[in-house]
Amino acid sequence: MNDPIKKTLTVPLSAQEAFDLFTTEMDTWWPKASHSVKGEKSKLSFPKHKGDPIVETGEDGEDAIWGKLIAYDPGKYLAFSWFPGRDEAEATVVEVNFTQTEAGTRCDLTHGGFDILGPTADAVSTSYLHGWDLVLGCYAGATKVPALT
């Protein structure tokens, strides 16, 4: 059984601003040059309604579904299934908690459910362990004051 990946990041924003940056503004900071299905010039859209997809639209107008929204509590919490470039039957789960602190907002990301991937679970989990560092570094960079722990 694979342990979930846990990453913590503090950003100098209110909880609502941090949440909005992570969701509705994802296209502005996500490292599409290295972490994309459709390429660097694609567009990302993050849903606001349970069951709706996280979509990457390529230059050719074709969509790739990265996951589906499970929970959406603005400024506090979100959860989504995650399967970019894979079949939905192989979806893992990402959860992000946004907690207001004196320093800004602590963002606690947990990515789990890798066992569904069978024999590739360890390799995929290890890839995401490092991949989230880059992704969250880009997210922090969009706030101008990165502080990944």
Q: What are these regions, as identified by a protein language model?
A:
Residues 1-19, 57, 92, 99-108, ...:
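Aromatic-glycine hotspot motif
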Residues 1-43:
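Hydrophobic ligand-binding cavity/cleft-lining segments
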Residues 18-22, 54, 69, 80, ...:
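Hydrophobic pocket/interface hotspot
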Residues 23-24, 74, 137, 144:
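Residues at helix-coil transition
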Residues 29-30, 72, 82, 128, ...:
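Tryptophan-centric aromatic hotspots in well-structured domains and transmembrane helices
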Residues 45, 59-103, 112-114:
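Hydrophobic-ligand binding "helix-grip"
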Residues 47-54:
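Short coil-to-beta transition motif at edge beta-strands of beta-rich domains
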Residues 112-149:
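A conserved amphipathic terminal alpha-helix motif
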